[in-house]
Amino acid sequence: MSKIYDWFEERLEIQAIADDISSKYVPPHVNIFYCLGGIVFVSFLIQVATGFAMTFYYRPTVAEAFTSVEYIMTDVNFGWLIRSIHRWSVSMMVLMMILHVFRVYLTGGFKKPRELTWVTGVILGVLTVSFGVTGYSLPWDQIGYWAVKIVTGVPDAVPVVGASIVELLRGGVSVGQGTLTRFYSLHTFVLPLLTAVFMLMHFLMIRKQGISGPL
């Protein structure tokens, strides 16, 4: 094993990377409330893992969506547990995100030179809410259908471009298969990709600038 490690160490300098990560200075004022952002990240990873598992059985069609969710809950081994963890972890993600925002605001973590870190955090908050909106529709039950109808109908009040925005969101004039397809694509591909990108940016800026000082 040592020879294999030495081979990689010679080419990638693994030890130098490990030393840099482990030797990062942590200010003495840091407490458990500074871990809230990390809990959000862990919740996101759980979302990705459980969501990916459900894509093997979920069918994004108006005729089969609800039936496929029922199948996951009743017939797939541990399917009920996977879907329940998916739902619980999103609740945890939203709660921890709200608490994280309060902690950052109260400790002044948004001030110079960390303005961009705050901006990426706000974008991540919007993406998190978007996950909830798009995911709510996927079972395509009565609650999901009417929730989507109301949410996608909100832009209709915007002058001139409102109707076009509604049609873009719904994939047509009315809520239907086009809407479900769009929301499924957003929920399983577009939003996770954007979230991963902005999380990486968020972490790199924190890594570069360090943790903000106490009040």
UniProtKB/Swiss-Prot annotation:
Q: How is the cofactor bound, in the record's words?
A: Binds 2 heme b groups non-covalently with two histidine residues as axial ligands. Binds one heme group covalently by a single cysteine link with no axial amino acid ligand. This heme was named heme ci.
What cofactor is needed?
A: heme b; heme c
Residues that coordinate or bind heme b 2 = 86, 187
Topology of the protein relative to the lipid bilayer: Multi-pass membrane protein
The entry lists its GO molecular-function terms as: electron transporter, transferring electrons within cytochrome b6/f complex of photosystem II activity; metal ion binding; oxidoreductase activity
A Pfam family name for this chain?
A: Cytochrome_B
Q: Name one GO cellular component term.
A: chloroplast thylakoid membrane
Q: Which residues bind heme c?
A: 35
Question: Binding of heme b 1: at which residues?
Answer: 100, 202
What NCBIfam families does this protein map onto?
PRK03735.1 (NF002990)
- Role noted for this protein: Component of the cytochrome b6-f complex, which mediates electron transfer between photosystem II (PSII) and photosystem I (PSI), cyclic electron flow around PSI, and state transitions.
Annotated family = Belongs to the cytochrome b family. PetB subfamily.
Question: What additional remark is attached to this entry?
Answer: Heme 1 (or BH or b566) is high-potential and absorbs at about 566 nm, and heme 2 (or BL or b562) is low-potential and absorbs at about 562 nm.
**Summary of subunit composition and partner proteins:** The 4 large subunits of the cytochrome b6-f complex are cytochrome b6, subunit IV (17 kDa polypeptide, PetD), cytochrome f and the Rieske protein, while the 4 small subunits are PetG, PetL, PetM and PetN. The complex functions as a dimer.
Q: What is this protein called?
A: Cytochrome b6
The taxonomy runs:
Eukaryota, Rhodophyta, Bangiophyceae, Bangiales, Bangiaceae
